[in-house]
Curated annotation (Swiss-Prot):
Keywords: Glycoprotein, Glycosyltransferase, Golgi apparatus, Membrane, Signal-anchor, Transferase, Transmembrane, Transmembrane helix. The gene is GNT. GO terms for molecular function: galactosyltransferase activity. It is found in: Golgi apparatus membrane. Residues 51-490 are lumenal. Its EC number is 2.4.1.-. The chain crosses the membrane at residues 31-50. InterPro entries: Galactosyl_T, Galactosyl_T_C, Galactosyl_T_N, Nucleotide-diphossugar_trans. This is Beta-N-acetyl-D-glucosaminide beta-1,4-N-acetylglucosaminyl-transferase. One of its GO terms (biological process) is protein glycosylation. It is a single-pass type II membrane protein. Gene3D superfamilies: Spore Coat Polysaccharide Biosynthesis Protein SpsA, Chain A. Residues 1-30 are cytoplasmic.
């Protein structure tokens, strides 16, 4: 019932009741609909913990220039390194040298901006084509399996330190981010590979927690920050492979720890050592999942391979542009080569994830707010345990695919909508997709007292075309990635 009185604005006469009610009802419906839409939108943003970027001021520092087309590219482009080495499998087919379509102006500009953003001064870095010289331990005493200096579980610092604070904090870390214990000789040399783009705050939150933990563990380590410098969608697998190859140009490392920049360890009994039996998953328990294993096949966050293991599986896939699928594909590669999967116990393999407050409106489908949404769905449906909506199931992720239309971190860290189809061809393309097919160039190589910083450029078309077309993507999605058989180790 609409109890309204409408008056003519021109004649001053009363408008017909029917016309009045019709017009007022139409306006009321529009107002109600608009209000409802605003309410739903507000609730959705609240539930999913969407965040505005407080780092938007840095976004311009990392804004990439468009890649020139093949018709306009000049011969001043950077010549690609041949990524094929003598330690690759005998079945590997060497790739010819390629030209990466990266304008030198873009490379130089990106290089300067990154140094300013993450060190405040370019004087702290030096460019050295001869690489770093490692100084190893002179002690003949083997390091103990369980060092006495371990503190156990600790409360990590969530403060993002400055470059100068970190450099002063760790004077024993040598140029290039290398450290070796003085009182004993470690059993292996370890390369920490950190894939990176536009995550200064995360990097400088990770390092003040990671470095002292590695020191207490008597790890002989070198930290490599591998940054994607081209404006392609972020590809973590390519950075893993490039980091592996570039690290081997520094030293013949025994162990490679592939470490997400936002994963902060909180227990130093989680020893950063590789295992000759098989690859190790170091991070089963993360705070956003209440320190419980998210799903049985989880292989993301922090993982470790020996040099031979990573070579045997042909490294990581180069085809996953965007979020999702690359870690599960990496796990499958080990399974295909009959390597047993090892996982640290939940008593020690614990991590806190740095809050993702990035530029753009992207939603992390595994955020706390997202899990609250799944909980509400499950309660509302009143279904049995076997019918619950899994946070990693296919249809909820489509919701995030549609929401994540804006680029994350100003660089395109979006959900990959084809990740399950790419995953379906994992076994068939493993021998042709990886370190033996990687085409990339080193846009810069810089060392500092904290890390070795390597800029990596690549072209998506060149990367994709290096794989046979029938092996790049399958016709149907494969959702079997949720399962995995692991042996728990301490």
């Amino acid at each position: 019932m609409y109890l309204v009185v409408c008056w003519g604005r021109v004649t001053g006469n009363m408008i017909s009741t029917r016309h009045c009610f019709s017009r007022c009802k139409s306006r009321s419906v529009r107002v109600i609909k608009a209000t409802a839409m605003l309410f739903v939108a507000a609730m959705l943003f609240l539930a999913l913990h969407m965040n505005f970027s407080h780092e938007a001021s840095q976004q311009n520092l990392h804004r990439a220039a468009p890649i020139s087309s093949p018709t306009t590219i000049s011969r001043s482009t950077v010549q690609i390194r041949n990524a094929t080495h003598d330690f690759l499998p005998a079945s590997s087919t060497p790739m010819k040298d390629e030209l990466i379509e990266t304008e030198s102006e873009f490379v130089d500009g990106f290089q300067r901006n990154e140094v300013i953003a993450c060190s405040d001064t370019s004087e702290e870095f030096r460019t050295d084509s001869k690489r770093i010289t490692l100084v190893n331990s002179q002690s003949g005493v083997p390091c103990p399996i369980r060092p006495p200096a371990l503190a156990g579980r600790f409360v990590p610092s969530k403060k993002s330190s400055t470059y100068h604070e970190l450099a002063a904090m760790f004077p024993d870390v040598q140029d290039g981010g290398h450290y070796t214990p003085r009182m004993c000789t470690p059993a292996e040399k370890t390369a920490i590979i950190i894939p990176y783009r536009n995550r200064c705050r995360h990097l400088y939150t990770l390092l003040p927690n990671l470095i002292p933990m590695l020191m207490r563990q008597n790890v002989d380590f070198t930290i490599f920050v591998i940054e994607q410098t081209t404006p392609e969608t972020f590809n973590k697998g390519i950075l893993f492979n490039a980091g592996y190859l570039e690290a081997l140009k520094v030293d013949n490392y025994d162990c490679f720890i592939l470490h997400d920049v936002d994963m902060i360890p909180i227990d130093d009994r989680n020893m950063y050592r590789c295992n000759k039996m098989g690859p190790v998953h170091f991070s089963p328990g993360v705070n956003k999942f209440k320190y419980k294993l998210f799903y049985s096949g989880l292989f993301g966050g922090v993982v470790g391979f020996t040099r031979e293991q990573f070579r045997l599986i042909n490294g990581a896939s180069n085809l996953y542009f965007g979020w999702g699928g690359e870690d599960d594909d990496l796990r499958n590669r080990a399974v295909h080569m009959k390597l047993p999967l090892l996982r640290k116990t939940l008593a020690h393999g614990l991590y806190d994830m740095v809050s993702h407050v990035e530029a753009g409106w992207n939603v992390n489908p595994h955020s706390k707010g997202a899990h609250s949404l799944y909980d509400m769905l499950n309660k509302a449906l009143g279904v049995q345990a076997g019918w619950n909506v899994h946070p990693n199931s296919k249809w909820p992720l489509r919701l995030f695919d549609s929401v994540n239309h804006a680029p994350a971190e100003g660089a395109g860290w979006n959900v990959n909508p084809d990740r399950f189809k790419i995953y379906s061809t994992s076994r068939q393309r493993q021998h042709v997709d990886g370190i033996n097919s990687l085409v990339y160039n080193v846009t810069w190589y810089r060392t500092s007292p904290l890390y070795t910083w390597v800029g990596v450029g690549f072209n998506k078309t060149v990367i994709t075309n290096s794989i046979p077309e029938d092996l790049r993507i399958g016709p149907e999605a494969d959702n079997t990635y949720l399962t995995g058989n692991f042996t728990i180790i301490s």
